[in-house]
Regions:
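Bacterial N-terminal signal peptides that target proteins for export
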Residues: 2-11
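Short non-domain terminal segments
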Residues: 4, 16-17, 280
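Bacterial N-terminal signal peptides
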Residues: 11-22
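Compositional signal for N-terminal targeting/processing segments
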Residues: 23-288
Protein backbone atom coordinates (compact mmCIF):
# COMPACT_ATOMS: atom_id res chain seq x y z
CA UNK A 1 0.00 0.00 0.00
CA UNK A 2 2.80 2.38 0.93
CA UNK A 3 4.58 1.54 -2.31
CA UNK A 4 1.45 2.28 -4.35
CA UNK A 5 0.95 5.63 -2.57
CA UNK A 6 4.59 6.55 -3.08
CA UNK A 7 4.45 5.63 -6.75
CA UNK A 8 1.25 7.65 -7.16
CA UNK A 9 2.80 10.66 -5.45
CA UNK A 10 5.93 10.47 -7.60
CA UNK A 11 3.76 10.32 -10.70
CA UNK A 12 1.83 13.38 -9.53
CA UNK A 13 5.04 15.27 -8.87
CA UNK A 14 6.40 14.32 -12.29
CA UNK A 15 3.23 15.60 -13.96
CA UNK A 16 3.59 18.83 -12.00
CA UNK A 17 7.20 19.21 -13.04
CA UNK A 18 6.38 18.62 -16.68
CA UNK A 19 3.60 21.20 -16.37
CA UNK A 20 6.01 23.76 -14.93
CA UNK A 21 8.56 23.05 -17.64
CA UNK A 22 5.85 23.47 -20.24
CA UNK A 23 4.78 26.80 -18.78
CA UNK A 24 8.31 28.20 -18.65
CA UNK A 25 9.79 26.68 -21.78
CA UNK A 26 11.98 29.00 -23.76
CA UNK A 27 10.59 30.36 -26.99
CA UNK A 28 13.26 30.59 -29.62
CA UNK A 29 13.40 34.11 -31.07
CA UNK A 30 12.15 34.40 -34.63
CA UNK A 31 14.72 35.48 -37.17
CA UNK A 32 12.87 38.11 -39.21
CA UNK A 33 13.60 38.00 -42.92
CA UNK A 34 12.53 40.97 -45.03
CA UNK A 35 10.16 40.34 -47.92
CA UNK A 36 11.99 40.59 -51.25
CA UNK A 37 9.75 43.52 -52.21
CA UNK A 38 11.27 45.51 -49.35
CA UNK A 39 14.88 44.95 -50.34
CA UNK A 40 14.71 45.77 -54.05
CA UNK A 41 16.81 48.64 -55.41
CA UNK A 42 15.57 52.18 -54.66
CA UNK A 43 13.26 51.07 -51.83
CA UNK A 44 15.30 52.98 -49.24
CA UNK A 45 16.46 56.53 -49.93
CA UNK A 46 18.76 58.89 -48.04
CA UNK A 47 16.74 62.08 -48.50
CA UNK A 48 19.72 64.38 -47.91
CA UNK A 49 21.65 62.93 -50.85
CA UNK A 50 18.99 61.18 -52.92
CA UNK A 51 21.09 58.01 -52.88
CA UNK A 52 19.63 54.54 -52.46
CA UNK A 53 20.63 52.49 -49.43
CA UNK A 54 20.55 48.82 -48.62
CA UNK A 55 18.71 47.81 -45.43
CA UNK A 56 22.06 47.16 -43.73
CA UNK A 57 23.39 50.59 -44.73
CA UNK A 58 20.26 52.19 -43.29
CA UNK A 59 20.66 50.36 -39.99
CA UNK A 60 24.27 51.49 -39.75
CA UNK A 61 23.20 55.11 -40.32
CA UNK A 62 20.38 54.97 -37.78
CA UNK A 63 22.60 53.30 -35.18
CA UNK A 64 24.81 56.40 -35.10
CA UNK A 65 22.00 58.55 -33.66
CA UNK A 66 21.10 58.62 -29.95
CA UNK A 67 17.42 58.98 -30.88
CA UNK A 68 15.51 57.60 -33.85
CA UNK A 69 11.87 58.11 -34.80
CA UNK A 70 10.24 55.64 -37.18
CA UNK A 71 6.94 56.55 -38.79
CA UNK A 72 4.55 53.84 -39.94
CA UNK A 73 1.19 53.35 -41.59
CA UNK A 74 -0.64 51.48 -38.87
CA UNK A 75 -2.49 48.97 -41.06
CA UNK A 76 0.33 47.98 -43.42
CA UNK A 77 1.89 44.64 -42.45
CA UNK A 78 5.07 45.42 -44.41
CA UNK A 79 5.69 48.34 -42.04
CA UNK A 80 5.49 46.09 -39.00
CA UNK A 81 7.82 43.60 -40.62
CA UNK A 82 10.37 46.38 -41.12
CA UNK A 83 9.99 47.46 -37.48
CA UNK A 84 10.58 43.91 -36.29
CA UNK A 85 13.64 43.71 -38.49
CA UNK A 86 14.99 47.02 -37.17
CA UNK A 87 14.73 45.99 -33.51
CA UNK A 88 16.40 42.71 -34.45
CA UNK A 89 19.30 44.29 -36.33
CA UNK A 90 20.11 47.57 -34.56
CA UNK A 91 21.25 46.00 -31.26
CA UNK A 92 23.77 43.96 -33.27
CA UNK A 93 25.61 47.23 -33.97
CA UNK A 94 25.28 48.86 -30.55
CA UNK A 95 23.25 48.21 -27.38
CA UNK A 96 19.66 49.44 -27.47
CA UNK A 97 18.72 51.80 -24.64
CA UNK A 98 14.93 51.73 -24.97
CA UNK A 99 12.06 51.36 -27.43
CA UNK A 100 8.99 53.57 -27.14
CA UNK A 101 5.57 53.02 -28.70
CA UNK A 102 2.75 55.38 -29.60
CA UNK A 103 0.53 52.35 -28.95
CA UNK A 104 1.28 52.33 -25.21
CA UNK A 105 0.07 54.80 -22.57
CA UNK A 106 1.31 55.58 -19.04
CA UNK A 107 -1.47 53.57 -17.37
CA UNK A 108 -0.14 50.46 -19.12
CA UNK A 109 3.49 50.97 -18.13
CA UNK A 110 3.38 49.14 -14.81
CA UNK A 111 1.90 46.03 -16.42
CA UNK A 112 4.27 46.21 -19.36
CA UNK A 113 7.31 46.46 -17.08
CA UNK A 114 6.08 43.59 -14.91
CA UNK A 115 5.47 41.31 -17.89
CA UNK A 116 8.79 42.29 -19.45
CA UNK A 117 10.63 41.34 -16.26
CA UNK A 118 8.84 37.98 -16.28
CA UNK A 119 9.61 37.32 -19.93
CA UNK A 120 13.36 37.76 -19.47
CA UNK A 121 13.37 34.08 -18.52
CA UNK A 122 11.27 33.39 -21.62
CA UNK A 123 8.12 31.92 -20.04
CA UNK A 124 5.35 30.91 -22.39
CA UNK A 125 2.43 33.35 -22.22
CA UNK A 126 -0.59 32.85 -24.43
CA UNK A 127 -1.57 35.80 -26.60
CA UNK A 128 -4.85 36.32 -24.76
CA UNK A 129 -3.16 36.38 -21.35
CA UNK A 130 -0.37 38.62 -22.61
CA UNK A 131 -2.81 41.17 -24.03
CA UNK A 132 -4.75 41.14 -20.78
CA UNK A 133 -1.62 41.51 -18.64
CA UNK A 134 -0.46 44.63 -20.47
CA UNK A 135 -4.03 45.92 -21.04
CA UNK A 136 -3.43 46.02 -24.77
CA UNK A 137 -5.75 48.43 -26.62
CA UNK A 138 -7.72 46.42 -29.17
CA UNK A 139 -7.81 49.52 -31.37
CA UNK A 140 -4.30 48.45 -32.36
CA UNK A 141 -4.92 45.06 -34.04
CA UNK A 142 -2.89 42.34 -32.32
CA UNK A 143 -2.43 40.52 -35.61
CA UNK A 144 -0.46 43.57 -36.78
CA UNK A 145 1.49 44.29 -33.59
CA UNK A 146 1.63 41.04 -31.64
CA UNK A 147 4.93 39.70 -33.00
CA UNK A 148 6.66 43.06 -32.44
CA UNK A 149 5.32 43.35 -28.89
CA UNK A 150 6.44 39.83 -28.01
CA UNK A 151 9.94 40.56 -29.30
CA UNK A 152 10.17 43.82 -27.34
CA UNK A 153 8.84 42.30 -24.12
CA UNK A 154 11.49 39.59 -24.28
CA UNK A 155 14.29 42.11 -24.93
CA UNK A 156 16.63 43.31 -22.14
CA UNK A 157 16.06 47.04 -22.71
CA UNK A 158 12.89 48.78 -21.45
CA UNK A 159 9.73 49.00 -23.53
CA UNK A 160 8.16 52.37 -22.74
CA UNK A 161 4.87 54.14 -23.32
CA UNK A 162 4.90 57.34 -25.37
CA UNK A 163 1.27 58.40 -25.70
CA UNK A 164 -1.43 60.07 -23.61
CA UNK A 165 -3.92 58.21 -21.47
CA UNK A 166 -7.58 58.39 -22.49
CA UNK A 167 -8.36 60.53 -19.44
CA UNK A 168 -5.71 63.04 -20.47
CA UNK A 169 -7.19 63.24 -23.97
CA UNK A 170 -10.72 63.79 -22.65
CA UNK A 171 -9.52 66.52 -20.29
CA UNK A 172 -7.56 68.24 -23.07
CA UNK A 173 -10.57 68.11 -25.40
CA UNK A 174 -12.78 69.72 -22.74
CA UNK A 175 -10.11 72.23 -21.72
CA UNK A 176 -8.05 73.10 -24.82
CA UNK A 177 -5.14 75.47 -24.31
CA UNK A 178 -1.94 75.86 -26.30
CA UNK A 179 1.47 74.26 -26.64
CA UNK A 180 4.48 76.39 -25.75
CA UNK A 181 7.42 76.44 -28.11
CA UNK A 182 9.10 78.19 -31.01
CA UNK A 183 8.96 75.52 -33.72
CA UNK A 184 5.86 73.45 -33.02
CA UNK A 185 3.61 76.51 -32.68
CA UNK A 186 4.36 78.09 -36.04
CA UNK A 187 1.09 78.99 -37.83
CA UNK A 188 2.02 76.89 -40.86
CA UNK A 189 2.51 73.83 -38.63
CA UNK A 190 -0.87 74.17 -36.96
CA UNK A 191 -2.53 74.91 -40.29
CA UNK A 192 -1.09 71.75 -41.83
CA UNK A 193 -2.23 69.66 -38.87
CA UNK A 194 -5.72 71.18 -39.03
CA UNK A 195 -6.02 70.51 -42.76
CA UNK A 196 -4.87 66.93 -42.27
CA UNK A 197 -7.49 66.39 -39.55
CA UNK A 198 -10.23 67.98 -41.67
CA UNK A 199 -9.31 65.82 -44.64
CA UNK A 200 -9.18 62.59 -42.64
CA UNK A 201 -12.72 63.27 -41.35
CA UNK A 202 -14.18 64.09 -44.75
CA UNK A 203 -14.71 67.76 -43.95
CA UNK A 204 -17.50 66.91 -41.50
CA UNK A 205 -15.97 68.53 -38.42
CA UNK A 206 -16.91 71.92 -37.04
CA UNK A 207 -14.26 74.62 -36.73
CA UNK A 208 -14.30 74.16 -32.94
CA UNK A 209 -13.75 70.42 -33.25
CA UNK A 210 -10.81 70.97 -35.59
CA UNK A 211 -9.18 73.38 -33.13
CA UNK A 212 -9.58 70.94 -30.25
CA UNK A 213 -8.34 67.96 -32.23
CA UNK A 214 -5.35 69.94 -33.49
CA UNK A 215 -4.44 70.72 -29.89
CA UNK A 216 -4.73 67.06 -28.90
CA UNK A 217 -2.59 65.99 -31.86
CA UNK A 218 0.10 68.42 -30.74
CA UNK A 219 -0.28 67.32 -27.14
CA UNK A 220 0.39 63.73 -28.23
CA UNK A 221 3.44 64.89 -30.18
CA UNK A 222 4.70 66.82 -27.16
CA UNK A 223 4.29 63.77 -24.91
CA UNK A 224 6.14 61.57 -27.39
CA UNK A 225 8.98 64.10 -27.57
CA UNK A 226 9.20 64.30 -23.77
CA UNK A 227 9.16 60.51 -23.48
CA UNK A 228 11.83 60.14 -26.15
CA UNK A 229 14.10 62.69 -24.48
CA UNK A 230 13.66 61.08 -21.05
CA UNK A 231 14.27 57.52 -22.26
CA UNK A 232 17.62 55.72 -21.94
CA UNK A 233 19.64 56.12 -25.12
CA UNK A 234 19.96 54.98 -27.81
CA UNK A 235 16.18 55.33 -27.95
CA UNK A 236 13.84 54.28 -30.75
CA UNK A 237 10.25 55.55 -31.11
CA UNK A 238 7.64 53.88 -33.31
CA UNK A 239 4.68 56.11 -34.18
CA UNK A 240 2.33 56.96 -37.00
CA UNK A 241 3.79 58.81 -39.96
CA UNK A 242 2.06 62.10 -39.11
CA UNK A 243 3.60 62.02 -35.63
CA UNK A 244 7.03 61.16 -37.03
CA UNK A 245 7.35 63.77 -39.76
CA UNK A 246 9.75 66.67 -39.31
CA UNK A 247 7.19 68.98 -40.93
CA UNK A 248 4.54 68.88 -38.19
CA UNK A 249 5.36 66.16 -35.68
CA UNK A 250 7.51 65.00 -32.79
CA UNK A 251 10.85 66.32 -34.16
CA UNK A 252 9.59 69.92 -33.86
CA UNK A 253 8.75 69.34 -30.20
CA UNK A 254 12.19 67.83 -29.62
CA UNK A 255 13.63 71.05 -31.07
CA UNK A 256 11.49 73.11 -28.71
CA UNK A 257 12.38 71.09 -25.62
CA UNK A 258 16.04 70.30 -26.32
CA UNK A 259 17.43 72.24 -29.29
CA UNK A 260 20.89 70.69 -28.95
CA UNK A 261 19.65 67.09 -29.06
CA UNK A 262 19.78 65.32 -32.41
CA UNK A 263 17.20 62.91 -33.79
CA UNK A 264 17.04 60.89 -37.01
CA UNK A 265 13.72 60.25 -38.74
CA UNK A 266 12.82 57.26 -40.91
CA UNK A 267 9.39 57.25 -42.51
CA UNK A 268 8.12 53.95 -43.85
CA UNK A 269 5.86 54.98 -46.71
CA UNK A 270 3.70 53.30 -49.31
CA UNK A 271 4.79 53.73 -52.91
CA UNK A 272 3.19 56.76 -54.54
CA UNK A 273 3.39 59.02 -51.48
CA UNK A 274 5.70 62.01 -51.66
CA UNK A 275 8.28 62.07 -48.89
CA UNK A 276 11.21 64.49 -49.03
CA UNK A 277 13.93 65.88 -46.76
CA UNK A 278 11.44 68.25 -45.11
CA UNK A 279 9.68 65.19 -43.68
CA UNK A 280 12.49 62.79 -42.82
CA UNK A 281 16.13 61.82 -43.14
CA UNK A 282 15.30 58.50 -44.75
CA UNK A 283 12.30 56.91 -46.46
CA UNK A 284 11.64 53.21 -46.93
CA UNK A 285 9.03 52.56 -49.62
CA UNK A 286 6.73 49.55 -49.39
CA UNK A 287 3.82 48.04 -51.30
CA UNK A 288 0.34 49.00 -50.12
Amino acid sequence: MISIRLTSRIATLMVGLFFLIGCTQKIEPTNVQLDSQLTASDQIVDLATGKSLTPQQLVEQLAQSPRVIVGEKHDNHYHHQIEQWLVQEMPKIRPQGAVLLEMLTPSQQKGVSRVQAQMQSNPYIRDEKLQSAIKWNSGWPWEQYGALIRHLLSSPYPLLSANLDKEEVLFAYANPSSIMGQYSTQPIVQELISKTIESSHGGELTAEQVVKMTFIQQLRDRRMAESLLNAPTPALLFAGGYHATRAIGVPLHVQDLAPDESVKVLIISERGEEIDHLHADFVWYTPK
